[in-house]
């Protein structure tokens, strides 16, 4: 039976965890290492660091942060944001990341996914896709959701996997931070189109929304952030509901 995963996302800027709505209006929510340890203790299956500053000046700060966090964690740590080259991926993995998500750089140069998969293995390469509803399809955006492309999200997900991505992190820009639930139609469309795990992201407002991502969206994993940072719910409460609903998840014991 498929074990579903609960992934906690920490958006990092200037060495701190921040949160906003639709990638805007950021506020400070805490120290990354402390929050990572807390969420692991609560039962998170995986952690994702997204460097949303993506500035060269702060890149060294990020690697040091990854190193400090990875030393404290036993669960997998994924890192993304501003990853542009094979060397960037190598640096993240050497700092202690288990996986690296690639977004804008893959759109600019799709061969980067193949190069990274060949060098480090597909299991280390996550295609991060930010998508926004556009009529009867979803358009891919880059640069933190600011720059529209001509790519269709479902077709792009297929291409990313064909080029070597071992996982897809799929974020609905429309739902990001809105807490109205994941975009289940988008999640299902991509989940049905690829044969690698899909992480649903953007819109979690309750444990029931997470359950819907699995049961209705067909996701393999669900990413949560703001509702945990703000104490709306807990990892334990989400997992309890998933377990009651018959979904197979990892327990703390």
Swiss-Prot record:
Extract one GO cellular component term from the record.
Answer: cytoplasm
Which SUPFAM superfamilies does its entry note?
Ribulose-phoshate binding barrel
Q: What is the organism of origin for this protein?
A: Myxococcus xanthus (strain DK1622)
Q: Which residues form the active site?
A: 11, 130
Compartments, as annotated in UniProt: Cytoplasm
Q: So what does this thing catalyse?
A: 5-[(5-phospho-1-deoxy-D-ribulos-1-ylimino)methylamino]-1-(5-phospho-beta-D-ribosyl)imidazole-4-carboxamide + L-glutamine = D-erythro-1-(imidazol-4-yl)glycerol 3-phosphate + 5-amino-1-(5-phospho-beta-D-ribosyl)imidazole-4-carboxamide + L-glutamate + H(+)
Q: What is this protein called?
A: Imidazole glycerol phosphate synthase subunit HisF
> What family does this chain come from, according to its entry?
Belongs to the HisA/HisF family.
Record note on quaternary structure: Heterodimer of HisH and HisF.
Q: Where are the transmembrane segments?
A: none
Q: Which gene encodes it?
A: hisF
- Top-level taxon: Bacteria
Q: What is its main location?
A: cytoplasm
């Amino acid at each position: 039976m498929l074990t579903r995963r609960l992934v906690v996302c920490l958006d990092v800027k200037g060495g701190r965890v921040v949160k906003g709505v639709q990638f805007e209006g950021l506020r400070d929510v805490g120290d990354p290492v402390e929050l990572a340890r807390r969420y692991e203790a609560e039962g998170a299956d995986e952690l994702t660091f997204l460097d949303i500053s993506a500035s060269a000046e702060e890149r060294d700060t990020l690697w040091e942060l990854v190193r400090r966090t990875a030393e404290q964690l036993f669960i997998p740590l994924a890192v993304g944001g501003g990853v542009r080259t094979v060397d960037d991926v190598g640096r993240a993995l050497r700092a202690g990341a288990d996986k690296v998500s690639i977004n804008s750089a893959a759109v600019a140069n799709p061969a980067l996914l193949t190069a990274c998969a060949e060098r480090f293995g597909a299991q280390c390469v996550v295609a991060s896709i930010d998508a926004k509803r556009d009529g009867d399809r979803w358009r891919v955006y880059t640069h933190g959701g600011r720059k529209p492309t001509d790519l269709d999200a479902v077709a792009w997900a297929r291409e990313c996997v064909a080029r070597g991505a071992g996982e897809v992190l799929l974020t609905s820009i429309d739902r990001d931070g809105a807490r109205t639930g994941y975009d289940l139609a988008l999640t299902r469309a991509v989940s049905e189109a690829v044969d690698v795990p899909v992480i649903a992201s953007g819109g979690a407002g309750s444990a029931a929304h997470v359950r819907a991502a699995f049961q209705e969206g067909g996701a393999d994993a669900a990413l949560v952030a703001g509702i945990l940072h703000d104490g709306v719910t807990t990892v334990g409460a989400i997992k309890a509901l998933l377990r009651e609903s018959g979904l197979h998840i990892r327990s703390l014991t």
